[in-house]
């Protein structure tokens, strides 16, 4: 796998305009919708249990994000996820803050037990806690755990029968057999709330058009990281507000050629 091979997936997203059904958190809803629109996907935010199964059945991908947990949202996620499974719609799960509280951890482990996942995406602490491995956590952000990120990712992929994506300074994608590290991105992403949540939804748009989920995830992460680098080059000295606006611009303007030129991926 190389940057030339993955670079074309962004073109497929823009040509296909896939419908991405998000059951996400209240903090990031607007940013997520605008980011998907900028990319060229079509977002829908449908949360009511009365409609989520129907909406999920017609989507290109379903993204479940437990950032602001409520029991009614968990019920909606389970209904939507099972509908997506019945209709061969890929499901992505973002276990935000898994390990922070007992309830959050319980939900983070229950959803993969009930729903077949195409992708699970989180930081190292979150993924470790989903599979009951010890890792420090502070709020919804990764702590300074000492575990090996690649081994945690592989273990999660094997135990959950999915593609595991662990993001951080370097990003890891694995299905338990193929493992790729992506080294794009910029530290200013951590100064904007919701960039990780949007990333999961962007991966959803790529998964909707590329059925090799490892390739789709690597392409999405590389695209996202390159877009962040290009945005930071123009705005980082101005601050996170200017960066956020320019980042949306770059989600719209970053090309397959940019991915091929600036992407940094390594198969390990």
Curated annotation (Swiss-Prot):
Annotated ATP binding sites: 121, 167
Entry's Gene Ontology BP terms: thiamine biosynthetic process; thiamine diphosphate biosynthetic process
Catalytic reaction list: 5-(2-hydroxyethyl)-4-methylthiazole + ATP = 4-methyl-5-(2-phosphooxyethyl)-thiazole + ADP + H(+)
The protein's Enzyme Commission number: 2.7.1.50
Keywords recorded for this protein, A-Z: ATP-binding, Kinase, Magnesium, Metal-binding, Nucleotide-binding, Thiamine biosynthesis, Transferase
Cofactor: Mg(2+)
MF annotations from Gene Ontology: ATP binding; hydroxyethylthiazole kinase activity; magnesium ion binding
Residues that bind substrate: 45, 194
Pathway the protein acts in: Cofactor biosynthesis; thiamine diphosphate biosynthesis; 4-methyl-5-(2-phosphoethyl)-thiazole from 5-(2-hydroxyethyl)-4-methylthiazole: step 1/1
Gene3D superfamilies per the UniProt record, alphabetical: 3.40.1190.20
InterPro entries: Hyethyz_kinase (IPR000417), Ribokinase-like (IPR029056)
Family: Belongs to the Thz kinase family.
Biological role: Catalyzes the phosphorylation of the hydroxyl group of 4-methyl-5-beta-hydroxyethylthiazole (THZ).
Protein name (database record): Hydroxyethylthiazole kinase
Organism, scientific name: Bacillus anthracis
